[in-house]
Regions:
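Binding-site signature for planar aromatic cofactors or substrates
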Residues: 1-122
Length: 122
């Protein structure tokens, strides 16, 4: 389960989101306005393309997050798990209803089930 402290950090900051393509090539993007629901991270997809394509071949993903004041005291975590992309249903409806997404055309919800959390050392 994702702790309350990590949940706050995740929901208040941009995250790096890494996927792996068909030929094993890594791809990393920044995502924001994500939500933590239990042991899952829910990402709203308004513009994500290559990462979605990569998930068709490999569902293993990694996210990284750190605090905004990292230059004073760096606190960060890597969150690894498996991702699924939803273009309809409960998770799609959930992200479409989020106030942060008002005015955006949401294409899908990416739901990452977190299997491992690692504290990053600075």
């Amino acid at each position: 389960m994702i702790s309350i402290g990590i949940k706050k950090l995740v929901e208040a900051n941009a995250l790096g989101f890494a996927t792996i393509g068909k030929k094993g090539k890594p791809h990393n993007i920044a995502v924001a306005y994500v939500k933590v629901v239990g042991d899952q991270i829910v990402i709203s997809n308004a513009h994500i393309k290559e990462s979605i394509s990569n998930l068709k071949y490999n569902k293993n993903v990694s996210l990284v997050v750190w605090n905004k004041d990292y230059d004073k005291a760096c606190i960060g975590f890597e969150l690894a798990g498996t991702a699924s992309n939803y273009t309809e249903g409960k998770w799609y409806d959930y992200v479409c209803s989020l106030p942060d997404n008002e005015g955006y055309k949401i294409n899908s919800a990416i739901v990452v089930k977190i299997l491992k959390i690692k504290k990053l050392l600075s």
